[in-house]
């Protein structure tokens, strides 16, 4: 089902054309497998190598529609990656959201390190190059995210001014 997503197929092939990138696939398991994985303490792993997702540099999540938001939490939890971006450690994967629902990322912003807004194939080469340069220079994940934040196509919640939300509860119905 997951590979029927044309955007995912394009990115998968594009990333794997680079000699310095190995892109693998991982999918949110159905309830029966989720239960077994939790009972047996099996972390979520990649389809190709069976390596735990937590060992990757990046975890890219395609957000096709709002109903899949809970799957994001399931994937992070099964991967043993902190749900909240602010709680992630230096060796955790950088969690990037993309796809149609990335155009309005605020409802789920606290779970992602960054979002790519727009057509992914236009910027990822620059993003991978920046990550590689940051790593070679001994930079941290925070350094990389900060460097990525000025690009208007990248939304990095931790480096974006948070707006105060005002709540005005309904006083009554007539």
Predicted regions span which residues?
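Conserved alpha-helical elements of sugar-nucleotide-dependent glycosyltransferases
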Residues: 3-11
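A conserved amphipathic helix/loop scaffold
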Residues: 164-167, 174
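Short helix-loop-beta junction
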Residues: 10-22
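Glycine-rich beta-alpha loop elements in corrinoid/cobalamin-binding modules
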Residues: 28-165
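ER/secretory pathway lumenal C-terminal domains and tails of membrane proteins involved
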Residues: 13, 171-173
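General small-molecule cofactor/ligand-binding pocket signal
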Residues: 24-26
């Amino acid at each position: 089902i997951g590979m029927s997503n044309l955007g995912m197929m394009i990115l998968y092939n594009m990333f794997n054309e680079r000699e310095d990138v190995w892109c693998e696939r991982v999918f949110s398991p159905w309830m029966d497998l989720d239960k077994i994985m939790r009972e047996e303490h099996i972390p979520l792993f990649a389809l190709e190598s069976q390596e735990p997702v937590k060992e990757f540099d990046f975890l890219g999540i395609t957000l096709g529609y709002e109903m899949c938001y809970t799957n994001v939490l399931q994937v992070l939890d099964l991967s043993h990656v902190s749900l909240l971006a602010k709680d992630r450690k230096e060796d955790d994967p950088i969690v990037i959201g993309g796809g149609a629902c990335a155009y309005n990322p605020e409802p789920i912003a606290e779970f992602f390190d960054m979002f790519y807004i727009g057509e992914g194939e236009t910027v990822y080469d620059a993003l991978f190059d920046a990550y590689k340069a940051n790593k070679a220079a001994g930079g941290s994940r925070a350094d990389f995210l900060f460097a990525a934040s000025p690009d208007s196509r990248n939304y990095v919640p931790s480096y974006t001014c948070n707006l105060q939300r005002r709540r005005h509860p309904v006083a009554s119905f007539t």
